Amino acid sequence: MALKIYNTETRQKETFTPIQPNKVGLYVCGVTVYDYCHVGHARVMVVFDTVVRHLRSLGYDVTYVRNITDIDDKIIQRALENKESIQSLTSRFIDAMHEDEKALNVLRPDMEPKATEYMDEIETMISTLIEKDFAYPAENGDVYFHVKADDDYGRLSGKNIEELDSGSRVEINSVKKDPLDFVLWKASKENEPAWQSPWGDGRPGWHIECSAMSTKCLGNHFDIHGGGLDLSFPHHENEIAQSECATGEHYVNSWMHCGFVRIDDEKMSKSLGNFFTIREVLKQYHPEVIRYFLLASHYRSPVNYSEENLDVAKASVGRLYSALELVPADQAEPAESKLEAEFMAAMNDDFNTPQAMAVLFELAKEVNKQKSPGLAALLKKLANQIGLLEQTAESFFKSQPSDSDLTDEMIEALIVERAEARKAKDFSRSDEIRDELLAQGIELLDSAEGTSWRKI
């Protein structure tokens, strides 16, 4: 089955055909680095990491670009509040972002352009838009894109100019020609960073940054552009307008958007203050559990964040690892099975990870039934393609976050003491040790080979 991707612009699934045979250019809007990443950011990271993994499994040579917004009103404000330099603030949170995504087994993008490193490209694009009468300098030193000069504006969101006009606020004494116009260049203010330009010192607007970076890294016309659903309008709509008016070429073939992570029916966001950072959640749940939770819903659907749903994810990942616990996955080549074709068909159907995971559970059931190392190897291989089952079962079960103060050595010592108690027929002490460990979230598993343990 050929790969099909739901294109936000056409509102339908389309068979994916790359612009250049066997090559894919993918650009994703990344994080504005003024705070720690939250679970909403994690979803975008994990979803597009999974998209890239699948494209590569199909044999495509993928160039994955995910930008970093390192200059922005929020960044400036946070740096002032913290009494630290913008460079210090953004460097700190870029490092934190990389730590978080590494924990979630998210592979680093091939390119990670920062807005502040692309000022020449931004200036060139703005100059081109002014020359072509799609943009104009205002009397206050700002530069604006003139929305009504672009006859095609609104095609991604399905909004037409009349609708936008009726919903726009009348601005008194505005320097804009029209309330719909958006900023490309902001004139500098006191105590704000600024770059020189033909229109005076200032800094770029958010939308133009992505147009300049994406076209510089991938060319004027590339295959896939992704991001969160909240970016489809106005950010991505404005990107299309700027890019196509500047270059005269079609900008992007396929637009992909992730649904929101929600808490109590509200989008998780820093501005609403209802967010959980990735590192907060990592204190409670194993990274693979968080990754599984984010992939258990189709990427276009909303995800409801709750401990109950994360607990379900924890149990589900545990079931998959349990299938590998007694059947070695590293001692055989992956077996042939129709389930592999079913897994690939699910992923080729607009990256349907819930259906692909259902196939993994079917495969786990067969591993448990047949005790086949070949099927275990296949389970691990397919799960790895979506970034799961990367550890050994023993390592997974022993590395769950826990409130217990017991070290591995202390647990092993208690297991030895329990074995001696059982040998001496002191079953009271044996049960006491088992219960003691269970109370600390440690489960003992007795078998013919001896006693093993796991965190629960």
Curated annotation (Swiss-Prot):
Pfam families: CysS_C (PF23493), DALR_2 (PF09190), tRNA-synt_1e (PF01406). The keyword Aminoacyl-tRNA synthetase applies. ATP binds at residue 270. Binds 1 zinc ion per subunit. GO terms for cellular component: cytosol. A motif ('KMSKS' region) lies at residues 267-271. InterPro entries: Cys-tRNA-ligase, Cys-tRNA-synt_Ia_DALR, Cys-tRNA/MSH_ligase, CysS_C, Rossmann-like_a/b/a_fold, tRNA-synt_1_cat_dom, tRNAsynth_Ia_anticodon-bd. It is found in: Cytoplasm. Its EC number is 6.1.1.16. Zn(2+) binds at residues 29, 210, 235, 239. NCBIfam families: cysS. Monomer. Belongs to the class-I aminoacyl-tRNA synthetase family. This is Cysteine--tRNA ligase. It comes from Hydrogenovibrio crunogenus (strain DSM 25203 / XCL-2) (Thiomicrospira crunogena). The lineage of its organism: Bacteria, Pseudomonadati, Pseudomonadota, Gammaproteobacteria, Thiotrichales.
